[in-house]
């Protein structure tokens, strides 16, 4: 059975430093598990690891998404699982590092893996609810009686 290592803790607790030390000892690569560090262009506000922090160790799923494109915990967990397999296929140890409890739960226990809400549709449904909640409920029951 192939294994991976997970480091979870609060902000500024030394997770990144520890993950790099362990990656060097275990011949590993680091996968981010942070709900904000996924976004590009906000590295300072999210404490994304710098090149210096990474110290030559490959890091994955940091700063890869535009902030205008939300990501669900389920979608993120799917990406992490893919990275784990890729790293293990290369004979290395995946080290999952971060502090996002919901993302960790999605990874270990499962969660809806669909994309985030369709915001225009959500807006229309919210307006329909405000206009006539009973009519919306009846409409929903016609689609899904349960």
Q: Where are the regions a protein language model picked out?
A:
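Phosphate/pyrophosphate-binding catalytic cores of soluble transferases and nucleic-acid-acting enzymes
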Residues: 1-146
């Amino acid at each position: 059975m192939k294994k991976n290592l997970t480091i979870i803790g609060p902000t500024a607790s030394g997770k990144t430093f520890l993950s790099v030390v362990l990656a060097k000892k275990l011949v590993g690569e680091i996968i981010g598990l942070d709900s904000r560090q996924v976004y590009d262009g906000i590295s300072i506000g999210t404490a994304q690891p710098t090149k210096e922090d990474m110290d030559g160790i490959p890091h994955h799923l940091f700063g890869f998404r535009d902030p205008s494109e939300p990501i669900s915990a389920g979608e993120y967990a799917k990406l992490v699982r893919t990275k784990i397999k890729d790293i293990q296929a290369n004979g290395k140890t995946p080290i999952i590092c971060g502090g996002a409890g919901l993302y960790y739960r999605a990874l270990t226990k499962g969660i809806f893996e669909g994309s985030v809400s369709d915001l225009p549709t959500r807006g229309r449904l919210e307006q329909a609810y405000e206009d006539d909640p009973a009519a919306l409920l009846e409409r929903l029951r016609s689609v899904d009686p349960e």
